[in-house]
């Protein structure tokens, strides 16, 4: 049997994983029975906060990464290099926990690290990895400082909150204009770490220019166990729109508390809402989730490949959250770079990532193009919870529903 038939190559992998049309048709992911690729294997650091306040998101991120690793290995691994050997790390929901894992992964000889999830973790872990010229692919972390420090080892697959906030506000203005401008006042509720505080600063700078008056900006720590006082403030000020920016647990609690206290603004419009674009939230608390809009990471709903993976994830009894398909796509990106580099050498892999044009992901991005570590094609979409489902409402090219605004009474 020839080497070509024995091992993973780029085209074959994309044709035989969840990225295959046949998988989309059946809802399963078919992997051919082929021999292991030649080589001793490639170690990949898979780093997420799987315990602590961010554990749900971290576990979802690990799930997505490992599904991609398992599929690549079932297809034979990386041609000429062997199978991917995942080195799992738990950031424990803290930057310090993350950097400790980077040290362990470097000692273990990983070729690359994927993950991090939270902005403050990613800032610390990418810096730690840079000391060893260890390539690092950020899955989600949105703080733009992650990619503005000149770190040659750092690559962010998704958009940062500069792009996200600009898109979110342009879309909010468009939705409001289309409805006859019923909304004029806003309150912002955000978590107080790097992610939420940075986003709140951008919103405060940009919302007034779009004709919105900001009544109040309310920070809160992560974790927060009680939002009664926050919701009482919202109820007293009665804003037209509430903009939450927080992680999953706090988002759910805020939305449920608003529902319980019968606070009904014209719209709940999230920017990177931790639960707003989550099937878990919609299933477990459908009444609290109704009509919530979000600007966030999301898969391309027209992409049959993405729908195939969704079926497989749900078949495992899990929810298809953005952490899953972002990490899945990131591992495919790394596999493609390893294939092109034909080496697990860190410098060669860094160069291969920097020159990537990978398009076999699940996102509405187009081909990957890194400029100073940022994927220039990455962009968020707007979603809304409609009929106990999550629909894309903007941009029109990816939409499968139209926005409902103001929220029905």
Listing of model-derived features with the role each one plays in the protein:
Residues 258-329, 396-408:
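Extracellular/periplasmic periplasmic-binding protein-like sensory domains
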Residues 1-12, 21-27:
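N-terminal secretory signal peptides
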Residues 45-66, 89-96, 117-120, 189-198, ...:
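Extracytoplasmic "Venus flytrap"
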Residues 56-61, 78-148, 157, 220-227, ...:
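Beta-alpha junction/loop-to-helix N-cap segments that form part of ligand/metal-binding clefts
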Residues 110-217, 266-290:
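Extracytoplasmic ligand/sensor domains, especially the bilobed periplasmic-binding protein
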Residues 63-86, 177-181:
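Signal peptide-proximal N-terminal region
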Residues 6, 29-53, 57:
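C-terminal segment of N-terminal export signals and the immediately downstream linker at the start
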């Amino acid at each position: 049997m020839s080497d070509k038939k024995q091992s993973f190559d780029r085209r074959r992998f994309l044709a035989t994983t969840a990225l295959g049309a046949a998988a989309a048709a059946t809802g399963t992911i078919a992997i051919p029975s082929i021999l292991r690729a030649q080589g001793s294997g490639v170690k990949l650091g898979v780093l997420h906060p799987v315990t602590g306040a961010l554990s749900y998101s971290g576990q979802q991120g690990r799930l997505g990464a490992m599904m991609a690793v398992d599929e690549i290995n079932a297809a034979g691994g990386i041609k000429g290099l062997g199978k991917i050997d995942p080195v799992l790390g738990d950031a424990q929901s803290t930057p310090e926990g993350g950097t400790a894992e980077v040290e362990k992964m470097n000692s273990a000889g990983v070729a690359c690290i994927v993950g991090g999830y939270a902005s403050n973790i990613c800032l610390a872990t990418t810096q730690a990895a840079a000391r060893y010229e260890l390539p690092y692919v950020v899955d989600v972390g949105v703080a733009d400082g992650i990619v503005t420090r000149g770190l040659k080892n750092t690559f962010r697959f998704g958009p940062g909150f500069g792009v996200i906030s600009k898109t979110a506000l342009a879309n909010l203005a468009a939705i409001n204009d289309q409805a006859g401008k019923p909304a004029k006042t806003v309150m912002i509720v955000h978590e107080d770490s790097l992610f939420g505080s940075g986003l709140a600063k951008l919103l405060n700078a940009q919302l007034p220019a779009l004709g919105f008056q900001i009544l109040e900006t309310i920070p809160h720590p992560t974790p927060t166990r009680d939002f009664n006082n926050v919701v009482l403030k919202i109820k007293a000020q009665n804003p037209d729109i509430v903009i939450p920016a927080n992680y999953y647990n706090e988002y759910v609690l805020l939305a449920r508390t608003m529902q319980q206290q019968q606070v009904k603004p014209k719209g709940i419009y999230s920017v990177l809402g931790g639960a707003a674009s989550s099937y878990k939230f919609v299933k477990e608390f459908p009444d609290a989730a109704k009509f919530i809009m979000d600007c966030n990471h999301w898969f391309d709903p027209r992409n049959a490949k993405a729908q195939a993976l969704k079926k497989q994830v749900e078949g495992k009894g899990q929810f298809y959250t953005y952490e899953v398909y972002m990490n899945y796509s990131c591992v495919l990106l790394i596999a493609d770079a390893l294939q092109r580099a034909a080496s697990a050498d860190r410098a060669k892999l860094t160069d291969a990532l920097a020159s990537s044009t990978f398009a076999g992901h699940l996102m509405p991005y187009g081909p990957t193009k890194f400029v100073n570590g940022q994927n220039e094609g990455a962009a968020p979409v707007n979603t809304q919870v409609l009929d106990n489902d999550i629909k894309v409402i903007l941009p029109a090219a990816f939409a499968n529903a139209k926005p409902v605004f103001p929220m029905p009474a």
